[in-house]
Amino acid sequence: EMCIRDSCGGVYPLGSDEIATKLSSVRALNEAKEKGQDLVTLCSACHHVIKRVNDDMRNVEDIRTRANNYMQLDEPYAGETNVLHYLEVLRDRVGFDELKKKVVNPLKGRKIGAYYGCLLLRPSTVLAFDDPENPQIIEDFIRAIGAEPVVYPYRNECCGGYISLKEKEMSGRMSCNIVDSAAGAGAEMLITACPLCMYNLNKSGSGKIPVYYFTELLAEALGVKEEALK
């Protein structure tokens, strides 16, 4: 097990000639490769950026060559590392049935809306995370910790993302629509797997229901003491 503290780069650059922004992701990917390990992240934005950069390093020769020329690694990196979101680890490695057996404090009676946003699901051909139109992984997670998932229309819509830095009013409207949609469908709270989404929904949303990170409820369901989280 290895902890990588490098930045993912923050945003996946859309310009085909933009290499420098991708190098921090390549560095993290190469570290995992050298250790012979998968790269697991808790953050949807990091997962999105790193997995797309990894796909570039596997499939786009020009980007791979230029990135390796910049990095000057002992051995060129060519996309060998497997990139996973922690939710994928829970689903595919641990298994939600096994997770359910470990729950000591089932969250019975709680009606929870899953907020996916856009970074976890798209582009689906690269991320291959879940069905981009009708994802189920977070709902399955909610069931595993003993709560009731609430499906609502805006769960896959963008929260405003990085435009919250410049267009606060627009981002606020987008976040409010999401929170209002979930509350209107009967959700008592929202969970997300993206720190930026959590920030936008809490700061710019309507405030009708609270928004939590999925790991907060996981810790509660597993009976993790609050002191252990500090």
Residue ranges and their predicted role:
Residues 2-4:
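Short, small-residue-biased leader/transition segments that mark boundaries at the very start
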Residues 15-37, 171-176:
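Short, structured active-site "lid" loops
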Residues 170-188:
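A short, acidic, amphipathic alpha-helical segment used as a generic capping/interface helix at domain edges
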Residues 69-93, 207-230:
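Short, flexible loop segments at boundaries between secondary-structure elements
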Residues 121-169:
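Redox- and metal-dependent alpha/beta enzyme cores, enriched for Fe-S-associated oxidoreductases
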Residues 94-112, 117-120, 215-230:
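C-terminal capping/extension of enzyme domains
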Residues 38-61:
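A basic- and aromatic-enriched beta-loop-alpha substructure that forms the phosphate/nucleotide-
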Residues 43, 193-194, 215:
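Helix N-cap/beta->alpha junction signal
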